[in-house]
């Protein structure tokens, strides 16, 4: 029988779940989940910031990924995310932010969920998390381009 304990972050978890996760998830997932990179937000009002917000109704994961682009070069200078979901969703978001920083929009658009899933060794039941990350970067790029187009039309 699992007991409950309160962790330092005031989240109540069944005792033993972290040990279970460590046995079931690849160390890269554990690393990105426990030490997520680039968590935060960018000012969505800026014309060089694109925001992608996606969700998976089946499991309740929600992912927001934001990119800040150098308008003159089309290179992603900064990237932030906030994800509400399982460890695989958080790890996929965190890994995606590392992957796209410094890439051109064209190169970032080419990233497929299979690349994320392979790098993190996600099990088949967690592939939707890597799909969310792919959808989020594409949505952020689309948002950035629509903002830029609107600015150019003025």
Curated annotation (Swiss-Prot):
Cofactor note: Binds 1 [2Fe-2S] cluster per subunit.
UniProt GO cellular component terms: cytoplasm; mitochondrial matrix
Pfam families reported in the protein's UniProt record: NifU_N (PF01592)
Keywords: 2Fe-2S, Iron, Iron-sulfur, Metal-binding, Mitochondrion, Transit peptide
Keyword Mitochondrion: yes
Subunit structure: Component of the core Fe-S cluster (ISC) assembly machinery.
Designated name of the protein: Iron sulfur cluster assembly protein 1, mitochondrial
Organism, scientific name: Eremothecium gossypii (strain ATCC 10895 / CBS 109.51 / FGSC 9923 / NRRL Y-1056)
Gene: ISU1
């Amino acid at each position: 029988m699992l007991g409950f304990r309160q962790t330092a972050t005031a989240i109540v978890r069944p005792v033993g779940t972290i040990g279970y996760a460590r046995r079931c998830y690849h160390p890269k997932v554990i690393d990105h989940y426990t030490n997520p990179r680039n968590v935060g937000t960018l000012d969505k009002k800026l014309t060089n910031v694109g925001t992608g917000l996606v969700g998976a109704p089946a499991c309740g994961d929600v992912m927001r990924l934001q990119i800040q682009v150098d308008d003159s070069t089309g290179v992603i200078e900064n990237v932030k995310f906030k994800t509400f979901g399982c460890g695989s969703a958080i790890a996929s978001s965190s890994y995606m932010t590392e992957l796209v920083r410094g890439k051109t929009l064209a190169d970032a658009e080419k990233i497929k969920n299979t690349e994320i899933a392979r790098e993190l060794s996600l099990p088949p039941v967690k592939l939707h998390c890597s799909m969310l990350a792919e959808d989020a970067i594409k949505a952020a790029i689309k948002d950035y381009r629509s903002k830029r187009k609107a600015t150019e039309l003025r």
